[in-house]
Each structure stands twice: as C-alpha cells, then as structure tokens.
Amino acid sequence: MKKFTYFTSEFVSPGHPDKISDQISDAILDACLKDDPNSRVACEVFCTTGLVVVGGEITTSTYIDVQDIVRKKIDEIGYRPGMGFDSNCGTLSCIHAQSPDIAMGVDIGGAGDQGIMFGGAVRETEELMPLALVLSREILVKLTNMMKSNEIEWARPDQKSQVTLAYDENGKVDHVDSIVVSVQHDEDTTHDEIEKIVIEKVVKPVLEKYNLSSDNIKYYINPTGRFVIGGPHGDTGVTGRKIIVDTYGGYFKHGGGAFSGKDPSKVDRSAAYAARWVAKNIVAAELADKCEIQLSYAIGVPKPVSVKVDTFGTSKVDEDKISEAVSKVFDLSPRGIEKALELREGNFKYQDLAAFGHIGRTDIDTPWERLNKVDELKKAIEL
C-alpha cells in the first residue's frame, strides 16, 4: 500500500477584504510612481462596512487623488450597492511624509529596512512553482473571470480556495486529495446549484489543464452551506495579511514582510522578487530541481548582509559552487535589484500583482520571472 504525505495551499480572490486593501495600497503606489518614479511610499489600507481608511508615509512630487483611486478600485473588483460594501463608502486619508531618518539611509542606496526575504523555485509546473499554490490560484482566476463576465450570475467577489496534494515516497505529486472552494453568492441560489457549477465548470477544467484526475477527490464547496454576507461587510480587511497567498502557498519559507503599498526601496518587496529571480534561474539552469534563496539586509547598508542557497539535496553540483556563482552573476544591492527588475519603470502595475499573486505569474511579464541568467550561471560554474 502506498504511503503518502500531504501538502496544502490556499488562495483568495481580489474581492477578499485583505486583497481589497492590498490592491488599493498598490494602486496608490502605482499612481505615485507613474508621475514620480522616485516616490517613497509605505501605504496601508483598512476596509470595513461603509469605510476605507488609507494611512502611511508618502513622499512624492506628484498629486494623487486618494478617494478617486479607492472608489475606482472597488468598482473594478466588482462590489455593487446591496452587497454591504461598494464605492459609495466613506474614505478617510491619513498620509504623511517619510521619516527623514529613514530617507537618509535610502538616499545613499541602502536598504529601506532590515529584514530577511525568501524566494524559491521547484520543478512541479512549467513556471517552476509549487503545484498546490498554482491550482488554488487557477481555480479563483477562472471563478473570478466567470463572475465578471456574468457566466456565473450568482457569484460575488469574495472567494477562497484550498488544494491538498498527496505526495509519494519519492516526493513527487501522486494525486489531488481534496479541494475547498468558498464563494460568496446571492440570496436565491441553492447550495446544490453552487456545488455543481463550481465543480463542473470551474474546478474540473483547471484539473484537466494540468492533466490531473478529478476522480476520488474530496470536495468541500461552501462547506458552511451559506456565504451571502462577505467582503468587508463580513470581515475587516487590512493590507499585508495574505503574504503566503502572495508568494508560494507555504511551500517555501517567508520572511514575514508584506509587499503591497511599498515602493521598491523596501527590500521586503524588492528582495523577495530578487530571491525568486535567483532561485528560478538556478532551477532552470538545471543546477537543482528545487531551490530556496534567503537574503538579509540592514537598514542603510547597500549590500545584503547574507545570501543563503538551499537546494534540499536536489543540486547537481556542490551548493557552495552555486552560492559563488550567485554572487558573481546577480547584483543583489537594493539599487541593483531595482534596476535589473525594472521596479520603477512602470512596465507592469503593482496593483495587478496584488490581485492574483506576485510570484509565478504567466499572464504578466514580470522581470523576476525571466530566465535571463541561466547561461551566466552555467558559465560561472563552468558547466
């Protein structure tokens, strides 16, 4: 009899209260960077029934209309009158300038704060991401798109998913064990109808895309039986509370720092992107099948305090050689990261990353997903 171990990841939709906050924070960041690429932004959002509070520290030469940004984003996500939360809500702005004590360290190219950041890659999907996270995300991408196109008319914006995979004794995915989907809905739709549509029209097509069997899966669709009250009317939302959803679904470690609302001088964001970039190129170069990078920084210091490579026993060459190659190939200073990953260029919108995840995106050309260092890594290791 086969022995299995189990691993689970979850995901939440753009209409989840915490994700509303993340997207508003990043929409404000995008607005600042659009007209002033050197803006310093640390923006936090709190949303609840009938109210959005925007706070933080912003130093910029441009003007941003906070209320307009908030209302447009709520409309875009899909909240309408009658849902307990919509763009007619009150908006309170409590923003002031960045502390000069922080600015003096960042101005010379140093990190905006101390901290540890992680990034990883694993050979489970084409984009070298953990499969459980990818499946959880794909389910909600499909469900959200079907809601917005009115293909599923009863669905509302607040949605969650969770996928459990069974791994064999060799650490390979054997099958999907269980799937949880909770979707906010209108008053009139029955639980049986919701369950049928979610399984047949949303989940099964996603599984087919990845050549996974839908047989014998344990499904939990709206397991409480009712999910009418949702969004910020059901739960308060705050920026930065979905950091595992934003990254690897718990498959790799996380340093604890959130991304949204932070300009690229904040290494919580920029260095986490860089760690993914490094790890993905290592795996793509076939130096390992699985890789996790840890970076650490000190406030005001231009270079990382430490760089750690962990290949979990899957490396094809000595880990020390990989570490040496990383130090030769990648400039992991805050300014080096900003330049290499085009973090102030405006080629992508941070608010789009806040909606469906910052890592492993295939629908957006994010520089940290590019495999542009594979040959240099191989050359550095003399393969």
Swiss-Prot record:
One of its GO terms (biological process) is S-adenosylmethionine biosynthetic process. Keywords: ATP-binding, Cytoplasm, Magnesium, Metal-binding, Nucleotide-binding, One-carbon metabolism, Potassium, Transferase. Its cofactor is Mg(2+); K(+). It is an enzyme of class 2 (transferase). Binds 2 divalent ions per subunit. Binds 1 potassium ion per subunit. Signal peptide: none annotated. It catalyses: L-methionine + ATP + H2O = S-adenosyl-L-methionine + phosphate + diphosphate. Pathway: Amino-acid biosynthesis; S-adenosyl-L-methionine biosynthesis; S-adenosyl-L-methionine from L-methionine: step 1/1. GO terms for molecular function: ATP binding; magnesium ion binding; methionine adenosyltransferase activity. InterPro entries: ADOMET_SYNTHASE_CS (IPR022631), S-AdoMet_synt_C (IPR022630), S-AdoMet_synt_central (IPR022629), S-AdoMet_synt_N (IPR022628), S-AdoMet_synthetase (IPR002133), S-AdoMet_synthetase_sfam (IPR022636). The keyword Magnesium applies. Residues 98-108 are annotated as: Flexible loop. K(+) binds at E44. L-methionine binds at E57, Q98, D235, K266. GO terms for cellular component: cytosol. Its EC number is 2.5.1.6. Pfam families: S-AdoMet_synt_C (PF02773), S-AdoMet_synt_M (PF02772), S-AdoMet_synt_N (PF00438). The keyword Cytoplasm applies. Mg(2+) binds at D18. It is found in: Cytoplasm. Homotetramer; dimer of dimers. Catalyzes the formation of S-adenosylmethionine (AdoMet) from methionine and ATP. The overall synthetic reaction is composed of two sequential steps, AdoMet formation and the subsequent tripolyphosphate hydrolysis which occurs prior to release of AdoMet from the enzyme. Belongs to the AdoMet synthase family. This is S-adenosylmethionine synthase. It comes from Fusobacterium nucleatum subsp. nucleatum (strain ATCC 25586 / DSM 15643 / BCRC 10681 / CIP 101130 / JCM 8532 / KCTC 2640 / LMG 13131 / VPI 4355). The gene is metK.
